[in-house]
Swiss-Prot record:
Broad EC category: transferase
E.C. code: 2.3.2.27
Name of the protein: Baculoviral IAP repeat-containing protein 3
Location relative to the cell: Cytoplasm; Nucleus
GO molecular function list: cysteine-type endopeptidase inhibitor activity involved in apoptotic process; protein-containing complex binding; transferase activity; ubiquitin protein ligase activity; ubiquitin-protein transferase activity; zinc ion binding
Length: 604
């Protein structure tokens, strides 16, 4: 298709500029018009009015789509105005917002054309009242004076809410001829929508007009663009293009949609919802649990100083959204900080050591400035809360969280009191959890500690299984699931993990039944307490695929004993529950370590 071959005006204009290039993309009305070649003839709305309103034809019935905001419309009726419908249904669309400003520019610039040129332009290009037709740079010294005036006028038309001439990545890349930095590549900047404007390292986005400078060595162009200008139409278009990567939750693919889920985010959590949403996470509504819209990775138990992007790269390095926004180099640096993470995840689930031990967690507390603390705590609202009897340390902690999350202190006593009451509820819940753990019987602790050894040494599974059924600890379905395992070792594994989930009463029944069924094993486990785990082989040298296969060997959820396991707990690495049972758990039922995150697995 050659849209300029019959236009003397455009042909002369192109000949006058050595660097000029006409780009065929959907931001150009002429190009949008070309998509209507197969548009149904009976539709009562003209193709020209649809293209002028920012729509291109999708090829399905009379359905059209906006190149900028992605709005899709069909079932057109007589009297419909595409532009008005566009404005009404998606008023925030950048293209729609630019229409009025473009029309104003058009009115002021029109007199600069001689009447002959104006008439020629309108007859040859009936759609030139809108911006966005020409892409590239224009010659500073055209040979034809008519073309010079035309260049001036089209430049004015393109001064809308975005820089149309920089719409093309190659055009943006050409502006970096004198780029001063070596650690940030012009290619990455151009790909992220930026073109160079100077001075120094100052760049601007062609779509939203946002400007950035003072770049640092670890900065990623795309992620900085997203962080500073999350509503940029270019960024939103990049993130919404699901053909670029597989998305787990389509409804959460926009930053705005994810951010809205944090409306009841606990004030006690010292991580900013804006940062979480930017990193691809949305709030699932339970405690501080979040999930990535793309890879479906889940994280929880956020602490002060946690960086959502770092945690995303640490636990889910293959997330396609993460790779696209932060880049492989960022992920490589994060992974390099945790060189044995995969080995730890794979080995912990089968570690013979004390499984009650908590994994170490990096905890970064914000530094305290006593003068700032005095100012922060010396307000009528804060003093009123303290006078009500709330602990000053709790008030201070709550105020710090509020300032970290919103950037401002409490203005109303009611808001502060509500958050303080919620914080007290959370503290009581944590205390109840600790009390429950402290009440674990010695029998259960011994079984948990020697879990791996019992997998090896326990042989009389069925009598113990029958005792649990008789005592009402397990039901017939749970009994049959374990009994139907083809190998004794597999039966033992399922039995022990089920006892750990069921708790103290199950442990007592196990002890009494074991004394009758296997007296020697009972003696070593409960009396002498010298039962030993005997490594059968070193699995660390096996391929990762084989380690994962072994990790995924047992497929029955230890909570419901019905569905297949599909959730790996982080950081302990246990794969013991299904996706439906996982959200209700705060601690791993096998080792009782706090669940910091989850990874969804798909077993073949």
């Amino acid at each position: 298709m050659n849209i300029v071959e019959n236009s003397i005006f455009l042909s002369n204009l192109m000949k006058s500029a050595n660097t000029f290039e006409l780009k065929y993309d959907l931001s150009c009305e002429l190009y949008r018009m070309s998509t209507y070649s197969t548009f149904p003839a009976g539709v009562p709305v003209s193709e020209r009015s649809l293209a002028r309103a920012g729509f291109y034809y999708t090829g399905v019935n009379d359905k059209v789509k906006c190149f900028c905001c992605g709005l899709m419309l069909d079932n057109w009726k007589r009297g419909d105005s595409p532009t008005e419908k566009h404005k009404k249904l998606y008023p925030s669309c950048r293209f729609v917002q630019s229409l009025n400003s473009v029309n104003n520019l058009e009115a002021t610039s029109q007199p600069t054309f001689p009447s002959s040129v104006t008439n020629s332009t309108h007859s040859l290009l009936p759609g030139t009242e809108n911006s966005g037709y020409f892409r590239g740079s224009y010659s500073n010294s055209p040979s034809n004076p008519v073309n010079s005036r035309a260049n001036q006028d089209f430049s004015a038309l393109m001064r809308s809410s975005y820089h149309c001439a920089m719409n093309n990545e190659n055009a943006r890349l050409l502006t970096f001829q004198t780029w001063p930095l070596t650690f940030l590549s012009p290619t990455d900047l151009a790909k992220a929508g930026f073109y160079y404007i100077g001075p120094g390292d100052r760049v601007a986005c062609f779509a939203c007009g946002g400007k950035l400078s003072n770049w640092e060595p670890k900065d990623n162009a795309m992620s900085e663009h997203l962080r500073h200008f999350p509503k940029c139409p270019f960024i939103e278009n990049q993130l919404q293009d699901t053909s670029r990567y597989t998305v787990s939750n389509l409804s959460m693919q926009t930053h705005a949609a994810r951010f809205k889920t944090f409306f009841n985010w606990p004030s006690s959590v010292l991580v900013n919802p804006e940062q979480l949403a930017s990193a691809g996470f949305y709030y699932v509504g339970n405690s501080d649990d979040v999930k990535c819209f793309c890879c479906d990775g889940g994280l929880r138990c956020w602490e002060s100083g946690d960086d959502p992007w770092v945690q995303h790269a640490k636990w889910f390095p293959r997330c396609e959204y993460l790779i696209r926004i932060k880049g492989q180099e960022f992920i490589r640096q994060v992974q390099a900080s945790y060189p044995h993470l995969l080995e730890q995840l794979l080995s912990t689930s089968d570690s013979p050591g004390d499984e009650n031990a908590e994994s170490s967690i990096i905890h970064f507390e914000p530094g305290e400035d006593h003068s700032e603390d005095a100012i922060m705590m010396n307000t009528p609202v804060i003093n009123a809360a303290v006078e009500m009897g709330f602990s000053r340390s709790l008030v201070k902690q709550t105020v710090q969280r509020k300032i970290l999350a919103t950037g401002e202190n409490y203005r109303l006593v009611n808001d502060l009191v509500l958050d303080l009451l919620n914080a007290e509820d959370e503290i009581r819940e944590e205390e109840r959890e600790r009390a429950t753990e402290e009440k674990e019987s010695n029998d259960l602790l011994l079984i948990r500690k020697n879990r791996m050894a019992l997998f090896q040494h326990l042989t009389c599974v069925i009598p113990i299984l029958d005792s649990l059924l008789t005592a009402g600890i397990i039901n017939e379905q749970e009994h049959d699931v374990i009994k139907q395992k083809t190998q004794t070792s597999l039966q033992a594994r399922e039995l022990i993990d089920t006892i750990l989930v069921k708790g103290n009463i199950a442990a007592t029944v196990f002890r009494n039944s074991l004394q009758e069924a296997e007296a020697v094993l009972y003696e070593h486990l409960f009396v002498q307490q010298d039962i030993k785990y005997i490594p059968t082989e070193d699995v660390s040298d096996l391929p990762v695929e084989e380690q994962l296969r072994r990790l995924q060997e047992e497929r029955t959820c230890k909570v419901c004993m019905d569905k297949e396991v599909s959730i790996v707990f982080i950081p302990c690495g246990h794969l013991v529950v299904c996706k439906d049972c996982a959200p209700s758990l705060r601690k791993c039922p096998i080792c009782r370590s706090t669940i910091k995150g989850t990874v969804r697995t798909f077993l073949s």
